[in-house]
UniProtKB/Swiss-Prot annotation:
PANTHER family: MCG48959-RELATED, NEGATIVE REGULATOR OF SPORULATION MDS3-RELATED. GO terms for molecular function: peroxidase activity. The gene is ral2. The keyword Phosphoprotein applies. Essential for mating and for recognition of the mating pheromone, and for the determination of cell shape. Implicated in activation of the ras1 protein. The keyword Phosphoprotein applies. GO terms for biological process: cell redox homeostasis; regulation of conjugation with cellular fusion; signal transduction involved in positive regulation of conjugation with cellular fusion. This is Protein ral2. It comes from Schizosaccharomyces pombe (strain 972 / ATCC 24843). GO terms for cellular component: cytosol; endoplasmic reticulum. The modification Phosphoserine is found at S604.
């Protein structure tokens, strides 16, 4: 029993380092119900919702600086004010926040009503604009007329979406896409709707035969360079020569929480090219639906593994690199917690991030992923009861937890330029070809190279040479000054060369050779990818300017070679060079070795990505 407690203690101690707990400051939002949270760079906007304390719908907006956890309320400009709403959707597009649908409240009649209008907030001008909706069949009271109006384009009436709340949503290119949701009677709406953000018009409406809503499902956009596309898109996808792909997304659905059912749907949107679309629009003036089509595939079987996520309420889905991140509220009689699961494309497994002691207590709900820093952000309150807030659908913003995903091997791979086989072969030829200078290693060995390649592929090399020239100039002037004051005033020309054909790099021959191979070829071959050499290259990157991309590439390679034999070397190097995510992952591996080296099987209740 004492050994088990020791292992849990070690595991929790590493969680302390992979998670940062912060207290929100300044103008923190009150507890809210049904608000929207939108990421914007290093900030997050919180808009609308219902005040959990007095049940009033609000149209306030708050923004938090995620570097300082400082909140402030946004002051609007202009006369246009947004409509108070909750359980609406919020998306970011071109420095604008797009809010659709949700539920409104009439203070006079004390009635709720569903919406299908759009409010747009311009982040730069701090002004609002409004796009009215239209009365639809599922709006049964007159309150909606005050908001939605009736002045709409007769030709596009049939394309207006049904009013709804709790729907799914995303932005692909310049299109806002709305999926499903529920009406005022809580019936599911089986629709897909597309709004053209450029023209300000609804352009598509179609049946979507799924019961989707934020309580048990969510969606995420797939980047066009993601390996998930190769995994899910069929090889024999038939695409008309007159159409092009707008983008793709995943739907994750889970339901029947006693005996959980899961479904993953791949959806790709195609649009007719402009010339062809205009022809069809002329022939079918009333039916813009002809301009779009969806490819829908059930890819659930591709995401099956020995361990599977439990049923999650209000799931959130994100993609970071080759990882699909699923988070949400897990409720059973024995455990109530906010949990994170990751589908690793490399391992082809669902794995739970080990977060014992951090999100296992308190009330946590709204979340987002910071791609650039590989961090998962969760808003909540560490002292409240999750079950109580879940029953109220209440969100809190008093505390913020930052989880270093890279410490679990979940991160976005560095964006390296695409290196073709031909360009790599050319680089190798040049590496063994002509040269006009040399790299001098710590062993006093010389490696010939071409200065033009260094200038072109390593922009900071120019600064290094300029500083060398400046030093030579200063040394020359110092020597001249010793010969007498009459020589000091002579108009000597500036020195434009270092006078040397060698650049000293205080690293081994193997490390310098690997560095030059990267400069010439844009990649490293297997012989250079030993842990010791990669650690030396990481230190080299910190010692010279302009090697940030190479630094990220080496960190990625070190993640790939990390094992029990080199973990301490990698930990020390990562700590020395400031590679925090790699350092944390190595620390977690060291802690696991200290536990006795026993691996947790994939079917364990708490597997992790280092197994």
């Amino acid at each position: 029993m004492s050994e088990v407690k020791r292992n849990i203690s070690l595991r929790n101690s590493t969680n302390i380092f992979t998670s940062t707990f912060s207290l929100s400051s300044n103008n923190v939002p009150k507890p809210l119900i049904g608000e929207s949270v939108i990421k914007y760079g290093d900030e997050a906007f919180v808009y609308g919702g219902r005040d959990a304390l007095n049940a009033q719908l609000v149209n306030d907006m708050y923004v938090v600086d995620l570097n300082t956890c400082s909140w402030k309320q946004v002051e609007y400009q202009g006369n246009q004010k947004p409509i108070p709403r909750y359980f609406h959707s919020g998306d970011l597009w071109n420095n604008k926040l797009i809010f659709f649908g949700g539920m409104g409240f009439n203070d006079d009649t004390k009635c709720l009503y569903v919406l299908n209008d759009i409010d747009i907030y311009d982040i730069e001008t701090k002004q609002w604009s409004h796009i009215p909706g239209m009365i639809t069949e599922n709006q049964t009271n007159d309150d909606a007329k005050e908001v939605n109006g009736s002045d709409v384009d007769e030709k596009s009436k049939h394309l207006y979406p049904s009013a709804r709340y709790g729907h799914l949503h995303c932005v692909l290119d310049h299109y806002l896409i709305i999926f499903c949701g529920q009406d005022l009677s809580n019936s599911y709406i089986e629709e897909i709707n597309i709004f053209d953000l450029d023209s300000g018009k609804w352009v598509f409406k179609s049946l979507f035969n799924h019961h989707c809503g934020i309580y048990r499902s969510n969606c995420v956009v797939i980047n066009k360079d993601s390996e998930f596309l190769q995994m899910c898109r069929p090889i024999n996808t038939t695409q008309d020569s007159n159409e092009h792909s707008i983008g793709s997304l995943f739907f994750y659905l889970n339901y029947n929480f006693v005996n959980v059912k899961r479904q993953v749907i791949y959806l790709e949107l195609f649009e007719l090219d402009t010339a062809e679309s205009e022809k069809k629009s002329a022939a079918l003036a009333k039916d813009n639906n002809q301009s779009f089509r969806f490819l829908e595939l059930d890819v659930t079987e591709k995401f099956l593994s020995s361990a599977m996520p439990p049923g999650l309420r209000f799931p959130a889905v994100n993609i970071l690199g080759d990882n699909l991140i699923l988070s949400g509220i897990y409720l059973t009689s024995s455990r109530q917690a906010f949990v994170l699961w990751v589908y690793s494309l490399d391992k082809e497994l669902w794995l739970q991030l080990d977060m014992l002691g951090v999100l296992n207590h308190g009330s946590w709900f709204k979340c987002l992923v910071l791609d650039c820093t590989n961090r998962f952000v969760v808003f909540g309150n560490k002292t409240r009861k999750l079950t109580q807030d879940y029953n109220l659908r209440q969100s809190n913003y008093d505390h913020i937890v930052f989880i270093e995903l890279e410490g679990y091997g979940v991160y976005r791979k560095p964006q390296m330029g695409r290196v073709t086989e031909r360009s790599e072969q050319l680089g190798k030829l040049l590496l063994n070809g002509i040269s006009d200078m040399e790299i001098l290693t710590i062993e006093r060995m010389h490696i010939p190279c071409l200065s033009r390649m260094l200038y072109k592929r390593w922009p900071a090399f120019q600064k290094i040479m300029d500083r060398a020239v400046e030093k030579n100039q200063e040394a020359f002037q110092a020597e001249v000054s010793q010969l007498g004051p009459q020589l000091t005033d002579l108009p000597f020309s500036s020195i434009h060369s270092t006078g040397s054909r060698a650049l000293y790099m205080p690293y081994s021959f193997e490390t310098c050779s690997a560095f030059l191979h990267y400069i010439y070829c844009g990649t490293l071959n297997g012989s250079y990818c030993t842990a010791k050499n990669l650690c030396n290259l990481l230190i080299l990157c910190k010692g010279f300017e302009g090697l940030e991309t190479f630094f990220a590439y080496i960190v990625h390679l070190l993640h790939g070679v990390l094992n029990r034999n080199n973990v301490k070397l990698i930990y020390e190097t990562a700590a020395l060079t400031g590679a925090k995510g790699l350092q944390l992952r190595a620390l977690r591996r060291i802690a696991r070795i200290e536990q006795g080296g026993t691996a947790i099987s994939p079917t364990s209740p708490l597997p992790n990505l280092d197994d």
